[in-house]
Amino acid sequence: MAAATAPQGWQWGEPRALGRAVKLLQRLEEQCRDLRLFVGPPSLRDLLPRTAQLLREVAKARSDKTRGDPEGPGGAGDFLVIYLTNLEAKGRQVAELLPHRGKKDANQDVFPEGSRFRRQLAKLALIFSHMHAELSALFPEGKYCGHLYQITKGSANTFWRENCGVRCVLPWAEFQSLLCSCHPVEPGPIMQALRSTLDLTCSGHVSVFEFDIFTRLFQPWPTLLKNWQLLAVNHPGYMAFLTYDEVQTRLQAYRDKPGSYIFRPSCTRLGQWAIGYVSSNGSILQTIPLNKPLLQVLLKGQKDGIFLYPDGKNHNPDLTELCRAVLNQCIQVSQEQLQLYQAMNSTFELCKICTERDKDVRIEPCGHLLCSCCLAAWQHSDSQTCPFCRCEIKGREAVSICQAQERSMEVRTTAGDSGDNCHQEAAEWKLESVTPSAPPLPPEVPCPQRPQNKGWLTLAPFTLPRLRPPLPLPKMASVLWEVTSRPQVREGATESS
């Protein structure tokens, strides 16, 4: 698709375009009433009304001329032109596949499981799911925030903002040129494969939301495209645009071969992986490893005898080379910070939730630190927000705490990637400094003798006041006093009580 920009006078035609899109979704919803189409996730019967409602909210918010949404290149107007054009095209494809109500000669090939038409409908449902997620991320409750969207991985966020500014969407050709200046890719089939992986909505453009999902899936940043090439191009276990039900169907052929597995980007938790595998007793299971690099998960699964045969094949690719490049980010603690925490009878590296273990993981994108055990327990309680600030947890990063006196060249070469530019290798990562302020401290863990209290992590955290040095007292001019045995005779003296 060519680069789409908001045409002159688009602001007057935008309400009509949004109205047409809502009516299109309503017509498709009428065609999806057959119970044989009620499958998922994702399910068109659920997605169509939710997308229509979100578009109504967008239209309402955009009608308020006082909002002042960014309307420059790649802003709110450009995004809506691209989005609505793509929505109309995908809507027509869905309409051609779905049976029309009241017509007995309608297409019946869409109902049988495994048919070509059913597979096309499942892929379109995935695209509609991605489009709804993208619109929700850039227009939460209908209000545009694409210019403020924060990419989860720090280095990826820096790359986008330095090269794209406040734009939320770019034509593929322009984005390809920018990315290749940082991560070179040969033109041809590999570039086409990269485009199909990045462009989740199949619009011919790349949004900041799609780039966020891609960098979360194929982290870490220094080896981003190496990871993608090994996992999405060369690995036989990778499956693109596959749903939960289709994974179950595909693995049925390997039920007599425990250890067979395939993996796909999750359609319910974008930015995370879903792995389907055949267990030792022949049952088919699917799991979503929360906020962990797929490389580490597959290696551990191979070691444990769970992920052995990708798509039933005997050869399991070796991922150890890429895992060796995944180094812990080193958080540097200055002398000032050490003194600040000592004044609170604590230490910077101590986890402020359990007060037992040291911090070894950072929540992304908010950046709060805690120990991995507390984070695992917190997420096990089905909470996907930070226990400190309640921001959504989109990722995690292993870290180690380095005090100021421990600086050395060896530490400098094993630091993380948040401050380096895209041309540096992993061994050249720089230390990242931390703002000299104490994080908010949640309450301590209750004693284990009271298992009924399972909500200890949901209590609202309180913030300790930032400690400041004592204010200096003003200097007072010295006064010569006459020393006598009778203090009452001094001028200005008061009577003793």
UniProtKB/Swiss-Prot annotation:
List its EC numbers: 2.3.2.27
One cellular component GO annotation, for this chain's record?
membrane raft
**Reactions catalysed according to its record:** S-ubiquitinyl-[E2 ubiquitin-conjugating enzyme]-L-cysteine + [acceptor protein]-L-lysine = [E2 ubiquitin-conjugating enzyme]-L-cysteine + N(6)-ubiquitinyl-[acceptor protein]-L-lysine
Instruction: Extract the ranges annotated as region (SH2-like).
Output: 219-321
Q: Where is this region: 4H?
A: 7-145
GO BP terms: namely:
cell surface receptor signaling pathway; negative regulation of epidermal growth factor receptor signaling pathway; negative regulation of MAPK cascade; negative regulation of neuron apoptotic process; protein catabolic process; protein stabilization; protein ubiquitination; response to glial cell derived neurotrophic factor
Q: Which residues carry this modification: Phosphotyrosine?
A: 341
Cbl-PTB domain segment(s): 7-321
Under the heading Pfam families, the entry gives: Cbl_N, Cbl_N2, Cbl_N3, zf-C3HC4_3
Keyword Zinc-finger in the entry? The reply is yes
What is said about the domains? EF-hand-like and Sh2-like domains are required for N-terminal inhibition of E3 activity.
Q: What is the protein name for this chain?
A: E3 ubiquitin-protein ligase CBL-C
Q: Give the species.
A: Rattus norvegicus (Rat)
